[in-house]
């Protein structure tokens, strides 16, 4: 007997939709569980559980408050609109039809609409949990604004919170009004009959109360607008309240606030009198008042009173802007020195600057990456960054500038061996720091390394060389092995066809000590192998989120991070040093700018900032370190007096370490942040002027010279309010150990130059100023050098004409002798000539320019070699094989400088130097064969090179 079950089509559709909805619900639940649990495990392992729990708690509480308030408010609006409907009234056929359709499901629709809009409101409110926490934990700054005399903390913490709260309430009231009108129309409480509008009594009361609430909120909005004038750039002249704002807009906004409150009162009266004429007149009056106060009055005052006397009337407000901007950007204590620069040359002119000239960095970190790769990569699964870092080390009794890089892991180099086992379990880390003298080279033009090789040898002593956490680390690795088991993580190549293995020891990531955790991470990374692999067990740890910037950003979400972390060997370990900034766009009278635009130079990484990119206050409040082996993150309160830092210390107690815990070794590697210096030099280009009259006329505005090596604009994205593209070719600043004029000792500092800000035919690339920031924090544990961070500005006399970087580069490019030698270096197109960084140095009573010149063959495996040095002083230039020769050529055969470009440190000769020579020869044979497209010789040279490298590694290992 066959029994056939038949389901109505509607029931089948409901069943299918129910199953789909259930599956979607399960998937969403699983997604959130995986995300939240894995995040908790990550923070817990690092010891920052309080950070994520506080975030989640704040998000949850803010969401719930907003959700409950909006849901109840909107439900009450719709419920009241229905409750106050007329009981007996004739409706049109259309409205009657709508009532019949809606009535059966009215309650559920009202509930769903209320809950849905409440959820949206909750998400909106919770997205800025940071504003709420900052407001709840605010601290005074001790500094007040010049108009209202409010503490600056009011603008940092109170005003953003009040602004967002008002916007939230205003939108809620407007939504409540719209929904109430819809219900009233459907149920006849609001009818339009020809020219007449009819309202039921209940609807009249409800609309009047809602309108009164809206105008109360608008009144508060106008009142807050008074304070916003101190933060706006409406005048087009400065950020902050200028003459028109102080004398017209601020009083006008106060009047508008009173008008709005008066209109609200009229609506309240209407709720009881049913007379709409007065509130309608009030609304019209409010609109006219707003047009007059916001548009007509400021225009009239500006046009007929300010413009004819602008220089005098705006002087007071320009002065406030100058003082506030210089303080907010940390340039108010810049030490200015009038520098009378010489342009003539004479023998022995650099004798008093011998220490500086001996330290001139001729190694360009932006050009030697390929040389580091070809000479120190050793295997295809290692890599170096494109732009290397500049650091300094104490070697042989003195501090030497160095170009450094980490030999990081590159999974793309595995080729066909790029399996899951190799990706996740075997190739887990890079190996070793490579460092070369900044002021030296080999006779062949290669970097002169003082720390290199595998295993690492050199002058830095013994340290942990393995790099599990870096800029190029794999998305995730699983490390660890059972006690006594043979290690299976690849460590480094050790012999011909052989490899050395290791096992990670320590705590670097969440433990996979349960089936649930392995399931969670299998789902997170979309890899079932995490569950199935026999090499993953209770002993395993999973390492992920390994980029030092990302790690610091997660444990300190309130920080803005510098995009230029750099590695250093500190206390026997490799650590990444990351600079963190506290910023705000709420400092009264301070110039408002885009962080991304100000911090860009021709070598900056592209940055797309989510949310507001605006700033008018910045402090380098935190120095962070990330251990390259364990991934441990430490945050140090570098500027404990910063009020924003104090707030976040209250929000996340116990996450910041005091300065006293910084070791002497770490202190010696701390430097002045690159992006902060970029921002400050851009601000100082305009705000070196402190006289309001000169500032108003723009007669002494400066600019940053373009990078002479960049012929094409570098396109970058900004995130200020709306994403846009900017073009940045600003010459990058440079780190160097040098003695500035007027100083007794040389100091590791960062430098940049200024030229006049002009465009078109009137542009002049002559020097107007030279800026330095002391980057030497000293080496005393827990104590910052008093000179660290000191800004020094050499201001040139206006009657002097000293060539700027652009003019010097043009002189280099157009000099016939230099051109002839460059043509020889190009070898008929077989090699490329690459100019290095153009350094400007205030020595010899003037300015010395130095530029290394590199050559690179056209082969794919070629790398840059430093072959020549260009130098210039005044209008004289030299082009020689060494810096010393170039300086002597400039200064009539005797510069008086020491042996620049050579090292007097006793360096242990590399073991088996004959092998090194053979390796270099084989490498050149390989490059030449590839250039000539001789595949047979290329294969032979490659085989020979691998054999020699294996012998060298064996010799070092032994």
Curated annotation (Swiss-Prot):
Subcellular compartments: Cell membrane
- Give the record's keywords alphabetically: Cell membrane, Membrane, Transmembrane, Transmembrane helix
For this record, an example GO cellular component is: extracellular region
Q: What is its main location?
A: membrane
Residue ranges the record marks as coiled coil: none
Q: Where are the transmembrane segments?
A: 14-34, 59-79, 107-127, 166-186, 205-225, 249-269, 280-300
Disulfide bonds, paired cysteine numbers: none
Q: How does it sit in the membrane?
A: Multi-pass membrane protein
InterPro entries with a match to the protein in the record:
UPF0182 (IPR005372)
Among the Pfam families in the record, one is UPF0182
Into which family does the record put it? Belongs to the UPF0182 family.
Which PANTHER family does its entry note?
Answer: UPF0182 PROTEIN SLL1060
Name this protein carries in UniProt? UPF0182 protein TW644
Q: Which organism is it from?
A: Tropheryma whipplei (strain TW08/27)
């Amino acid at each position: 007997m066959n029994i056939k079950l038949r389901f109505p089509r509607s029931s089948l559709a409901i069943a299918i939709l129910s199953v789909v909805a259930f599956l979607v619900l399960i998937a969403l639940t699983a997604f959130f569980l995986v995300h939240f649990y894995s995040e908790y495990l990550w923070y817990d392992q690092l010891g920052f559980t309080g950070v994520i729990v506080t975030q989640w708690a704040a998000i949850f509480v803010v969401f719930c408050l907003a959700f409950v308030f909006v849901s109840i408010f909107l439900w009450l609006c719709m419920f009241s609109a229905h409750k106050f409907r007329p009981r007996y009234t004739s409706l049109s056929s259309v409205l009657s039809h709508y009532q019949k359709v809606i009535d059966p499901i009215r309650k559920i629709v009202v509930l769903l609409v209320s809950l849905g809009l409440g959820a949206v409101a909750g998400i909106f409110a919770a997205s800025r949990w940071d504003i709420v926490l900052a407001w709840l934990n605010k601290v005074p700054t001790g500094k007040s604004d010049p108009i209202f005399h409010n503490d600056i903390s009011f603008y940092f913490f109170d005003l953003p919170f009040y602004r967002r709260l008002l916007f939230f309430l205003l939108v809620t009231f407007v939504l409540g009004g719209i929904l109430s009108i819809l219900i009233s129309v459907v149920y006849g409480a609001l009818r339009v009959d020809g020219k007449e509008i009819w309202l039921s009594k209940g609807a009249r009361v409800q609309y009047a109360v809602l309108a009164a609430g809206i105008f109360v909120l608008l009144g508060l909005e106008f009142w807050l607008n008074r304070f916003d004038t101190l933060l706006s750039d409406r005048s087009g002249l400065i950020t902050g309240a200028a003459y028109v704002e102080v004398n017209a807009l601020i009083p006008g906004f106060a009047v508008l606030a009173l008008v709005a409150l008066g209109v609200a009162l009229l609506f309240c009266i209407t709720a009881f009198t049913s007379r709409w004429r007065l509130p309608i007149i009030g609304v019209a009056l409010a609109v006219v008042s707003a047009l007059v106060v916001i548009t007509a009055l400021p225009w009239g005052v500006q046009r007929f009173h300010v413009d004819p006397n602008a220089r005098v009337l705006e002087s007071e407000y320009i002065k406030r802007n100058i003082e506030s901007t210089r303080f907010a950007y940390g340039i108010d204590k810049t030490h200015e020195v009038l520098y009378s620069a010489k342009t003539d040359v004479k023998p022995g002119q650099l004798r008093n600057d011998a220490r500086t000239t001996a330290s001139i960095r001729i190694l360009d970190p932006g050009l030697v990456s390929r040389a580091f790769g070809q000479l120190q990569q050793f295997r295809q699964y290692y890599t170096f960054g494109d732009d290397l870092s500049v650091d300094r080390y104490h070697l042989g009794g003195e501090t030497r500038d160095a170009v450094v890089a980490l030999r990081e892991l590159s999974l793309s180099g595995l080729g066909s061996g790029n399996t899951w086992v190799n990706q996740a379990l075997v190739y887990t880390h890079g190996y070793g720091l490579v460092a070369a003298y900044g002021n030296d080279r080999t006779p062949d033009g290669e970097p002169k390394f003082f720390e290199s090789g595998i295993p690492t040898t050199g002058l830095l002593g013994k340290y942990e060389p393995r790099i599990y956490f870096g800029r190029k680390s794999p998305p995730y690795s699983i490390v660890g092995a059972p006690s006594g088991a043979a290690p299976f993580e690849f460590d480094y190549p050790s012999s011909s066809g052989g490899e050395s293995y290791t096992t990670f020891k320590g705590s670097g990531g969440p433990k996979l000590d349960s089936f649930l955790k392995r399931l969670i991470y299998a789902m997170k990374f979309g890899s079932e192998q995490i569950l199935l692999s026999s090499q993953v067990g209770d002993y395993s740890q999973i390492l992920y989120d390994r980029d030092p910037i990302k790690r610091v950003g997660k444990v300190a979400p309130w920080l803005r991070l510098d995009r230029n972390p750099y590695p250093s060997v500190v206390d026997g370990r490799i650590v990444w040093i990351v600079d963190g900034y506290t910023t705000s766009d709420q400092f009264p009278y301070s110039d408002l700018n885009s962080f991304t635009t100000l911090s860009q130079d021709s070598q900056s990484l592209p940055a797309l900032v989510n949310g507001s990119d605006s700033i008018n206050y910045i402090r380098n409040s935190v120095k962070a370190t990330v251990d390259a082996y364990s991934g441990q993150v430490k945050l140090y309160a570098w500027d404990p007096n910063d009020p924003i830092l104090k707030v976040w210390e209250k929000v996340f107690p116990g996450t910041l370490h005091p300065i006293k815990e910084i070791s002497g070794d770490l202190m010696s590697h701390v430097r002045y942040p690159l992006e902060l210096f970029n921002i400050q030099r851009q601000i100082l280009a305009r705000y070196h002027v402190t006289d309001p009259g000169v500032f108003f006329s723009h007669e002494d505005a400066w600019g940053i010279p373009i990078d002479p090596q960049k012929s094409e604009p570098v396109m970058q994205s900004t995130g200020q309010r709306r994403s846009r593209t900017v073009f940045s070719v600003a010459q990058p600043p440079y780190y160097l150990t040098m003695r500035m004029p007027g100083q007794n000792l040389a100091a590791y500092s960062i430098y940049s130059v200024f030229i006049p800000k002009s465009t078109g035919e009137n542009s002049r690339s002559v020097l107007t100023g030279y800026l330095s920031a002391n980057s030497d924090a000293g080496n005393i544990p827990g104590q910052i050098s008093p000179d660290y961070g000191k800004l020094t500005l050499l201001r040139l006399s206006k009657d002097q004409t000293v060539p700027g970087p652009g003019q010097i580069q043009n002189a280099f490019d157009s000099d016939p002798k230099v051109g002839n030698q460059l043509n020889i270096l190009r070898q008929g197109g077989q090699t490329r000539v690459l100019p290095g960084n153009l350094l400007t140095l205030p020595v010899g009573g003037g300015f010395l320019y130095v530029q290394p010149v590199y050559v690179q063959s056209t082969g794919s495996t070629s790398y840059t070699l430093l072959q020549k040095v260009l130098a210039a002083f005044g209008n004289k230039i030299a082009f020689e094989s060494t810096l010393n020769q170039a300086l002597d050529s400039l200064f009539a055969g005797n510069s008086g400088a020491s042996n620049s470009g050579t090292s007097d440190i006793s360096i242990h000769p590399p073991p088996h130097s004959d092998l090194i020579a053979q390796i270099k020869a084989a490498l050149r044979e390989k490059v030449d064969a590839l250039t000539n497209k001789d595949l047979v010789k290329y294969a032979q040279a490659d085989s020979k090179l691998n054999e020699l490298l294996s012998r060298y590694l064996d010799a070092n290992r032994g």
